């Protein structure tokens, strides 16, 4: 409800309409839709959701009036999106300055154990980036930019320990929450010196679950069975056989212990009692605007605000900022250049071969299955917000 209210407020302000414009009952919608002659475009125009209804050629001619003609296929003096991004967000200069620095470490994706590539957060690989910032004498403060629904509890703690190491080295760490910083995403943010979120950030989800997937029923349906002998009841447990009740008890006890640790670390970091943390925990999610009142977030703002806060905490008057990135291998550099040049062709092909609704739904299911299949916590214990998916 909070996210929906934020959405209505933003769109209403941008379009100059009343928020009640969105609170349409089914009866009211049918009445307006009938008045629009069953035309969705007319319905949108009458509700002031769009400014005009035009054909592509009419839009093209209007663009020509605005920016002039060109010899490209559209006949309009346009700038490609990639070129636009390069202008407004140019690559950071390679030349090193002698100024003190605020380092930005990006943690985006599901948190997994070990070393992971961009798009996921590796416990070891992200910890290495934080360590790199700690060992750089020019870095005086760090912003940890988080966009994650969580993941492995073990990997989350590996990252949090590096945050503590930075603080022990006298370098303040500010957490900047993006779309998500839930569950494991909050775990790695909790111990930072200050937490800054956007009003619509989904955070909290302080909870733990354990998972060990077995497939004996599916295999039984196919007539496939497995058996064996072991030195104890817990020896040789397998995904192709039912989970032993004793192992289930061990997993449950570990989940309870991890949840207790989660409550404890948040309690210590946020200056709250364990009972106060538990009252807003238990897996519940909160918007950034609500999280401030609950004591889970310190300030509303952007990553730029986080950089300013980090510089102030480090008492820096003049400073540079830079993103700490892992060093690419020669093979990765080659493929990056190759795919960078191929993106224009691929982009046009994808637009011309847009997926059907059925294919898109199939891809959505595959994405959800993929998240589960990649989970690799060594103890099968996860701090992951599975329902954190905004539509």
Predicted segment positions?
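Extracytoplasmic and endomembrane cell-envelope/extracellular-matrix remodeling and assembly machinery
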Residues: 57-104, 336
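Extracytoplasmic
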Residues: 6, 17, 47, 98-102, ...
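Intrinsic disorder and flexible/low-complexity segments
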Residues: 91, 97-137, 326-391
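Cleft-lining beta-strand/loop regions that shape enzyme active-site pockets
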Residues: 11, 93-218
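Short glycine/threonine-rich loop-to-helix capping motif typified by GTGT followed
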Residues: 153-158, 290-293, 333-338
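C-terminal intrinsically disordered, low-complexity extensions immediately downstream
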Residues: 305-337
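Charged, glycine-interspersed solvent-exposed loop segments at helix/strand-loop junctions
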Residues: 1-64, 216, 220-310, 314, ...
